[in-house]
Regions:
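Short aromatic-centered micro-motifs
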Residues: 65, 95, 202, 494, ...
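Acidic, glycine-rich flexible loop segments
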Residues: 380-409
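Extracellular/lumenal ectodomain signal focusing on beta-strand-rich modules
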Residues: 62, 86, 125, 145, ...
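Short, small/polar-rich motifs associated with maturation and membrane association
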Residues: 1-356, 360-365, 369, 426, ...
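Surface-exposed, extracytoplasmic segments of Gram-negative outer-membrane nutrient-acquisition systems
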Residues: 648-662, 700-724, 758-845, 853, ...
Length: 994
C-alpha cells in the first residue's frame, strides 16, 4: 500500500496537489517518511530541505518536488516547505504544481528556495465568469482574463490602466492620464447607444455596479472581461456594453505573510504645444504689443517638482478552515499642473470560513476609501497657448472686461480653491450551504456607498469676481450614492457517464439611491471663510431668494436568472442562460425584459487525427448568441414630471417659483436591446508554448432609445424619448501568446493583441417618429463655426461632416468645393452653406488597435517592453484651426501659423484641411526588475523594479498628443483645446514579502 501511495505522489501529483491542504501535518510527515524509507537503500547521500513560493513570495502548498530521473520525491506542506532524504550530489530537483511552470534547480548546499512562475498558457486555470467560475479550457464564450502578474507596471489612476492594450476589443481612453483626479473611459467592442450609455458594467468581487476608484492596484488579483452577449446576458439590462469582473486578492492556507508593495513616481512633460516665443511673437503677429516681460505661460503652469508615492501593506494567511487578507493603502500624487493633487487612504479586508465538516461556508468583503482632491481647470492650458507672452505672470488688470476670452491662466488656478472629498465604501456578506457534495445554495447581501463633497471658492482676486464687482464666490455640492444588493443562487451538478451537467438558478434585487444638494453665495466680508460660511455672503439676501437646490431619485431592479452548463466528454460543451428582469425606469407597459443566451463549443483537438499530433494540444471552436439590454439613461423619463419654470416676483408674495409639466411621458418606453453573435477559436499549440484566441463578432442594437420631435399640440413639449433606432458593430479580435525561449537561465515570451471594430447607426426613424440627423457639439467661440460631426441613417459612428478643402485664393482665403464635389466649382469657405457640406473621409473611431508585449527573464532579472497603437482614424485638430492661422483673434499662435499654414490668411472653416491622421504607435511601458536570492528566514521574496511609461510616440498628428483625444462614445476624434499635458512617467518600486 505504501508503495502504491508513493507512486501516486510522483506520477499523479496533480491529484495530490489538490488534496494536499486536506492532509494533516502528521499525514504529510508520514508520507515523507514512508517515501524515503522505500528508497533509502538506493540513496545514501545528503538531506535537502527547502521552500517553494510563488512570484509574490506566498508558499505553494502541495507542490511536487522530485529528483529528476527518479521516483524519490515529496510534496510541500502548508508553509511551502519540504524535506528530501538521500539526495545525491549534483542532483537536479524538479518542482511542479498545477498552473505553474515546472522548475529545475540544482541545490547549492543543503537548503534551497524555489520560486514558481505562473503558466500563462495553463488550460486548467479557473476564470471568473458571471455568477460563477469556469475552467479556462471549458469556456464557450468570448472571455479574456488578465492576472496581476501580467498587469502593466508603474503608476496608474485607475485599475483599467493596468490592462490598457491587454484585452482585444477593449478601448481604455485616458485623455488626461497625468491628472491624478482623472479616470479612464472604457468601451467594449464599439459604441452602439445614443442615450443609454456605452460604458461596461463593473463588478468587484461579485458586487455589480462597483467603482474602480475604490480599489488599490496592489489588491487586484485579476481583471476579466465578458465581451460577447452570451457571456454578459446573465447581467441583463446592464450587460450590453460588456462586463468587467474585478477579483481582489484572497488569503491562503498556511503561514501568515506580510507583504509590502510600494513605489515613488515623477512625471515629466512629454510634449508641449509649439507656440511662438516672445521674440517670434513680436516679429510675426500683426499689432503685437510688447509689455516688457518674457513669459512662457505654458511652462508657468507646470509643476516641475511633482512627486507621487503609493504604499500598500497586506496581512494574509489562514488555516485549512479559515483564510483572510487585510490590506491598507496610502497614495499621494501631484499633477503636472501647479494645483492638482490627490491623497487616498484605503482599507480592504476579506475572509472565508468553512465549518460543519465543509458543509457551511461564510465569507465577506469590506472596504473603505477616502480621497482628498485638489482640482485644476484644463482651460488654463488653452489660455496659455493663446496669451501674449510679454505680459507679466502677475498681470490681471489688462484682462478686465474681456468677457472671459482672455485671462491670466496662472491666477485662474491659484486664486481659486477647488476640490472634492470622496468616500467610497463597500461591505458584503456571503453564506453558502453545501447541502450535498453536488448541491449548494448561497446568499449574498451587500451595500456600496459613495459620498462626494465638492467645494469651489473663487477669491476676491479671481477674474470673475473682479469683473463682476463682488468679493468672493462660494459653491458647495454634496452627492450621495447608496446601492443595496441581495442575491440568492442555487447550484446543482451531476455526471452520468461522459455527460456532466451544471445547473444554476437565482434571484437578484438591487436598489440604487441618489441624493444631491448644492448651494452658493457671493460677496463675503472676507476670503477667510472659503466655503465654510455661505450665510455670510449677501448676494442671495438682497432679493430674498435662496441659492440652493436639492434632488433625490431611486431605481430598482428585480431579476430571476438561470444557467445550464453541459459537457460531453470534454468534446462538446454547451451553455444556456436566461434572465428575466424588471426595472423601474421603463414605461408601465414594458418594465420587464427577457434576456436569453446560448453558446456551444466543439473541442476539435479530440478528433482521432489530432491524438498523436505534436503540434496541437488543444483546439476549440465556439459559437455564441446572446441578448442583453441597456438602462443607462436618466430615471423617470418614461413618466410625466413636473419641473421648475423659473422664478417670478410678486409684490404681494415676493419671489415665487413656478412649476409645470417638464416632459412628454412615454408609457411605452421599453428596453434597448442588443443582439450579439460571436464565432471564436481557442488554440494551444506546440506543447503549450503558443496559445490564444480568434473571434469574429456582430452586435446589433435594436429599439435604441433617442429623443424625437413631436407636434405641438397635441404634445406639450417638442421632444419625446422613444425606442426607434438600430445600430450595428462588427469586427474581429486576435490574441496570441508565445513562449519563444525557455532555458534554465533565460526565457522570452511575447504576446500580440489585435482588434478591428466598426460601428454604424443603421436607422433613426420609423413610421411614427422621424429624425433626419443629429449633430455633435458645436465648436467654441470665437467664430462659432458649428459642428464637425453628424450622424444619420447609415453613417458610421464618429463620422466627420463639413466642407471639402480646395486650396486658397490669391488673398489666402480658404476655398471649398461647391456641393462637396472635388474637381468642380470652388467658392470661398466663408460663403459655404449646408448644401456644400458632405461627409469627410474617415471617422474618429480607430478601426485597428494593436499591442505587442515582450517579457525577458535572465536569472534574477526581468525586463518587459510593451508597445500599443491605434490606426485608421482621423482627428479634427482644433489646435490648428484656432491657433494655427494668422488671422485668428487671439494674441499668440502656434508656429505652424507662419510655417505649415502660412499660405492661409483668412479665417477658419470646418473642412478636411484640419482633419489629420490620428494613427500612432507608442512604446508605452518599459519595466526592469530584479529579484535577488535571499538567504534569510525573514524575507521570503524581494523584487525591485523601475518603470518608464510613454517612452516615445510615432505619429503624424500635430496636436499635443493623439492619446488626449477621446476615441470612445458617439462623438470621438475631436482634438479639443482644453488639453491637459501628457506625461512621461518614471516609477521606482519595491515588493517585499515576509
Amino acid at each position: 500500500m505504501k508503495k502504491n501511495f508513493v507512486n501516486l505522489t510522483m506520477r499523479g501529483g496533480g491529484i495530490l496537489c489538490l488534496l494536499a491542504p486536506m492532509f494533516s501535518a502528521n499525514a504529510e510527515n508520514s508520507l515523507r517518511t514512508d517515501a524515503s524509507f522505500n528508497l533509502s537503500s538506493v540513496y545514501q547521500d545528503e538531506r535537502i530541505s527547502g521552500t517553494v513560493v510563488d512570484q509574490e513570495g506566498n508558499p505553494v502548498i502541495g507542490a511536487n518536488v522530485i529528483i529528476k530521473g527518479t521516483q524519490n520525491g515529496t510534496i510541500t506542506d502548508l508553509d511551502g516547505k519540504f524535506i528530501l532524504e538521500n539526495c545525491p550530489a549534483n542532483a537536479i530537483l524538479q518542482v511542479s504544481y498545477i498552473g505553474y511552470q515546472t522548475q529545475e534547480v540544482v541545490p547549492e548546499g543543503t537548503s534551497v528556495k524555489v520560486t514558481l512562475r505562473e503558466d500563462s498558457q495553463n488550460l486548467e486555470e479557473v476564470v471568473v465568469v458571471g455568477y460563477g467560475s469556469s475552467v479556462k479550457k471549458d469556456l464557450t464564450t468570448a472571455v479574456t482574463s488578465v492576472k496581476s502578474k501580467d498587469f502593466l507596471q508603474g503608476a496608474v489612476n485607475d485599475a483599467m490602466q493596468l490592462v490598457d492594450g491587454k484585452v482585444a476589443g477593449v478601448t481604455v481612453n485616458s485623455t488626461a492620464a497625468s491628472d491624478p483626479n482623472s479616470s479612464s473611459s472604457i468601451q467594449v467592442r464599439g459604441a452602439s447607444s445614443l442615450k443609454a450609455g456605452n460604458s461596461p458594467l463593473i463588478v468587484i468581487d461579485g458586487m455589480p455596479g462597483g467603482d474602480l476608484r475604490n480599489i488599490a492596484q496592489q489588491d487586484i488579483e485579476s481583471i476579466t472581461v465578458l465581451k460577447d452577449g452570451s457571456a454578459a446576458a446573465i447581467y441583463g439590462s446592464r450587460g450590453a456594453n460588456g462586463v468587467i469582473l474585478v477579483t481582489t486578492k484572497q488569503g491562503r492556507a498556511g503561514k501568515t505573510t506580510i507583504s509590502y508593495d510600494g513605489y515613488v513616481e515623477h512625471d515629466f512633460v512629454a510634449n508641449k504645444p509649439d507656440v511662438l516665443d516672445p521674440d517670434a511673437y513680436l516679429a510675426n503677429v500683426t499689432g503685437a504689443v510688447d509689455h516688457g516681460y518674457r513669459t512662457d505661460w505654458y511652462d508657468e503652469l507646470i509643476n516641475k517638482n511633482n512627486f507621487g508615492h503609493n504604499h500598500n501593506i497586506a496581512l494574509a494567511g489562514g488555516s485549512e478552515s479559515t483564510i483572510f487578507r487585510i490590506s491598507t493603502n496610502f497614495k499621494q500624487k501631484e499633477g503636472l499642473d501647479i494645483v492638482s493633487k490627490r491623497k487616498e487612504y484605503g482599507l480592504r479586508g476579506n475572509f472565508k470560513h468553512i465549518t460543519l465538516e465543509d458543509r457551511l461556508e461564510v465569507g465577506g468583503n469590506i472596504s473603505y476609501r477616502i480621497a482628498d482632491e485638489d482640482c485644476t481647470d484644463y482651460g488654463s492650458f488653452k489660455q496659455a497657448v493663446q496669451l501674449n507672452p510679454t505680459y507679466s505672470v502677475d498681470e490681471m488688470e489688462a484682462f478686465q472686461g474681456s468677457g472671459g476670452y482672455s485671462y491670466n491662466p496662472v491666477k485662474n488656478l491659484t486664486e481659486r480653491d477647488r476640490g472634492a472629498l470622496q468616500e467610497y465604501s463597500m461591505v458584503d456578506f456571503n453564506i453558502k450551504l453545501n447541502i450535498l457534495d453536488n448541491l449548494n445554495t448561497e446568499l449574498k447581501l451587500g451595500r456600496q456607498g459613495h459620498n462626494k463633497k465638492e467645494q469651489d471658492y473663487k477669491y476676491s482676486t479671481f477674474r470673475e469676481c473682479i469683473d463682476g464687482g463682488y468679493h468672493g464666490h462660494a459653491y458647495i455640492k454634496q452627492e450621495n450614492w447608496t446601492d443595496w444588493t441581495l442575491e440568492w443562487l442555487g447550484n446543482y451538478e451531476f455526471t452520468i457517464g461522459k455527460h456532466n451537467t451544471k445547473i444554476m438558478g437565482g434571484y437578484s434585487y438591487q436598489e440604487f439611491n441618489y441624493e444631491e444638494f448644492d448651494a452658493e453665495n457671493r460677496n463675503f466680508p472676507t476670503d477667510a471663510f472659503l466655503t465654510n460660511n455661505l450665510g455670510a455672503g449677501d448676494y442671495q439676501k438682497l432679493d430674498g431668494r435662496l441659492g440652493m437646490n436639492s434632488t433625490k431619485n431611486q431605481e430598482k431592479t428585480i431579476a430571476f436568472l438561470g444557467r445550464v452548463n453541459y459537457n460531453y466528454n470534454d468534446l462538446f460543451l454547451f451553455t444556456g442562460s436566461l434572465r428575466y428582469e424588471g426595472n423601474t425606469k421603463f414605461g408601465a407597459d414594458n418594465k420587464w425584459g427577457l434576456f436569453p443566451a446560448a453558446s456551444a463549443a466543439w473541442r476539435v483537438s479530440k478528433l482521432p487525427v489530432f491524438e498523436s499530433s505534436s503540434v496541437v494540444d488543444d483546439l476549440k471552436v465556439r459559437f455564441s448568441y446572446g441578448v442583453t439590454g441597456r438602462s443607462g439613461f436618466d430615471k423617470y423619463i418614461s413618466l410625466a414630471k413636473y419641473t421648475g419654470y423659473g422664478d417670478y416676483y410678486s409684490d404681494r408674495f415676493g419671489w415665487i417659483k413656478g412649476y409645470g409639466p417638464g416632459n412628454n411621458p412615454n408609457y411605452d418606453l421599453g428596453w434597448e436591446k442588443q443582439v450579439s453573435y460571436n464565432l471564436g477559436i481557442d488554440y494551444t499549440l506546440f506543447k503549450s508554448r503558443l496559445s490564444g484566441s480568434l473571434d469574429l463578432f456582430i452586435r446589433d442594437g435594436r429599439d435604441v432609445i433617442g429623443d424625437y420631435k413631436v407636434p405641438l399640440p397635441p404634445y406639450l413639449h417638442e421632444t419625446i424619448t422613444a425606442n426607434v433606432g438600430t445600430t450595428t458593430s462588427k469586427g474581429f479580435e486576435l490574441q496570441a501568446n508565445w513562449d519563444a525561449v525557455q532555458t534554465k537561465d533565460f526565457t522570452y515570451s511575447t504576446n500580440v493583441v489585435l482588434s478591428y471594430t466598426t460601428s454604424k447607426l443603421k436607422s433613426f426613424s420609423n413610421e411614427k417618429y422621424q429624425l433626419g440627423y443629429i449633430d455633435g457639439d458645436g465648436f467654441p467661440s470665437p467664430g462659432n463655426p458649428g459642428s464637425a460631426q453628424r450622424l444619420q441613417d447609415g453613417t458610421p459612428i464618429g463620422s466627420f461632416y463639413g466642407f471639402k478643402y480646395a486650396g486658397v485664393d490669391e488673398n489666402g482665403q480658404i476655398l471649398i468645393w461647391e456641393g462637396g464635389k472635388e474637381g468642380g466649382t470652388t467658392k470661398l469657405g466663408a460663403d459655404g452653406n449646408e448644401q456644400d457640406k458632405v461627409y469627410l473621409d474617415g471617422t474618429g473611431v480607430p478601426k485597428w488597435e494593436l499591442s505587442w508585449g515582450n517579457t525577458f527573464t535572465y536569472k534574477n532579472f526581468d525586463l518587459s517592453i510593451f508597445f500599443r497603437g491605434r490606426f485608421d482614424y482621423k482627428i479634427m485638430n482644433q489646435y490648428e484651426m484656432y491657433y494655427g492661422l494668422q488671422v485668428i483673434a487671439v494674441d499668440n499662435k502656434l508656429t505652424s501659423a507662419y510655417e505649415e499654414n502660412a499660405h492661409i490668411k483668412g479665417p477658419k472653416v470646418i473642412c478636411d484641411y484640419f482633419l489629420q491622421n490620428g494613427n500612432y504607435l507608442r512604446l508605452d511601458n518599459i519595466t526592469l526588475g530584479w529579484t535577488p536570492k535571499l538567504n534569510t528566514k525573514w524575507i521570503s521574496n524581494l523584487r525591485l523594479y523601475a518603470t518608464i511609461k510613454n517612452v516615445f510616440t510615432l505619429t503624424k498628428y500635430t496636436g499635443v498628443d493623439p492619446t488626449t483625444v477621446t476615441t470612445t462614445g458617439l462623438w470621438p476624434g475631436i482634438g479639443g483645446m482644453d488639453v491637459y499635458p501628457t506625461a512621461r512617467n518614471l516609477t521606482f518600486g519595491v515588493q517585499i514579502s515576509y
